[in-house]
Design a protein with these regions (language model features):
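A structural signal for short, hydrophobic/glycine-enriched beta-strand patches
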Residues: 29, 57, 69-100, 187-189
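Terminal processing/anchoring signals of secreted or surface-associated proteins
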Residues: 1, 20-22, 51, 123, ...
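Bacterial Sec-dependent N-terminal signal peptides
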Residues: 1-29
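Conserved, well-structured interaction surfaces
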Residues: 89-165
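Secretory-pathway/luminal and periplasmic proteins that interact with or process carbohydrate-rich
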Residues: 56-61, 76, 157-170
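Membrane-proximal, proline-rich intrinsically disordered regions
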Residues: 20-71
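Short coil/linker segments at helix-helix boundaries
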Residues: 165-193
């Protein structure tokens, strides 16, 4: 009988404690609402650091857009493209052979594109709040520095996407100047397209 009472008490406590809304409404520490994040100068700094962290990834300037993928496309490396006796082929074999429709290359190109636009989306999110929350900065000059850095990074990322993905202006007797190139995104939307 005592065991039954103990089990009933434990079960009742479990149900009472897990049924509480505060226990169920838990968000990760790294996941913050935009209003909370951009309510302090430190939040804007965190957002800026987050953009730089995206830019340091291996599918961005941490490898592919510095010494990796682009250098292979430019044929800076004279790597053996054939399989060696150990079965090794280098990571950029398909890129060196201009096989862009291979799954690995499509994935690499897609990750470069999406990583850049993810950074642009983070910048645009910060730009929604930067003038509205001008008072959280220690001085107007600090506000201007943050805003300028966000704007410069957005322009830089768009230019790099243009450089990588737009048709050459010199193509087809300079008709490339009139060709559609890339989307210029200056407003944050949370809608998948």
């Amino acid at each position: 009988m005592k065991k039954l009472i103990n089990k009933t008490i434990i079960l009742s406590l479990f149900v009472a404690l897990t049924g509480c809304n505060d226990w169920l409404d838990v968000s990760p520490k790294a996941d913050r609402k935009a209003e909370d994040l951009f309510g302090t100068e430190a939040g804007f700094r965190d957002a800026l650091v987050g953009v730089y962290a995206l830019m340091c990834g291996t599918n961005s300037y941490g490898r592919d857009l510095t010494y990796g993928y682009l250098d292979v496309l430019a044929q800076y490396y004279n790597s053996p493209l054939k399989t060696t006796s150990s079965g090794y082929e280098h990571n950029f074999k398909n890129a060196a052979e201009y096989k862009y429709t291979e799954k690995t290359e499509e994935s690499r190109i897609s990750s470069i594109w999406s990583n850049h636009f993810s950074a642009v989306a983070n910048i645009n999110q910060a730009m929604l709040f930067i003038d509205e929350n001008k008072g959280v900065f220690t001085s107007p000059e600090v506000h201007d520095v943050y805003k300028g850095e966000f704007l410069a990074l957005r322009a830089f990322l768009h230019f790099d996407i243009l450089r990588l993905f737009a048709p050459s202006a010199a193509m087809n007797n300079n008709k490339g100047l009139d060709a559609l190139a890339i989307p210029y995104v200056d407003v944050f939307t949370n809608i998948a397209q």
